[in-house]
């Protein structure tokens, strides 16, 4: 007997239905939960609660967890190929997603040395700069590539110690919702990644204007949506990150980080 899969939102480490009970059908006969403003609020609250513990973990431990996520994703390769539509292109996309997780896992314990610095200053001071996480990051996932593009947005934010709230593509949400199942079994603490599905016109304005979101990645947005996000983000000086969905770079990690400079007197 075939058992039809039930897709749910992923909030605070738990798989939940939308509080409104609504659903929509973006891909054939599959029902997808239609997230609401309250679901978004709960996701941001969960991300904020998880931020302290996740950012306090050692860089090596964060790298181990990202690598574990890559292992779990690779182990479910056939499922993701099916969700993506099948064929060689889908197989290559899954491989790209695995490679992205492994690549960013390797950067976790190198970030402080590469992005940080000891600064020469005039005077009896020891001056140094260290990177710190921005905080809660909102991610608007790109339509294509649905899986690899999403992983390339999540991984750099997690690498730097941030927590994230993801809006999966409205018309192609299944890869993102299935990725949440991988993350739930990858030793990732609850609330570090929260995945929402639903109508973008309902969720995006609240994500952009939420005062407890510190940055937002707009890789999956149209130019018109980016303009409205930038306007809404100005209220709490929210960082707006614009990078291509297929891009992988250490600069993507630092885009979600604050550089803290410390002055320490010496010779006193």
What are these language model-derived features?
Residues 1-85, 241, 249, 258-268:
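Short, structured beta/alpha segment
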Residues 11-13, 19, 105, 141, ...:
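Pocket-edge structural micro-motifs
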Residues 34, 95, 198:
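Conserved phosphate-coordination/catalytic loops
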Residues 46, 68, 83, 100-103, ...:
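Alpha-helical scaffold segments in soluble metabolic enzymes
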Residues 54-154:
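N-terminal Rossmann NAD(P)-binding subdomain characteristic of aldehyde/semialdehyde dehydrogenases
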Residues 110-268:
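Rossmann-like NAD(P) dinucleotide-binding subdomain of oxidoreductase/dehydrogenase enzymes
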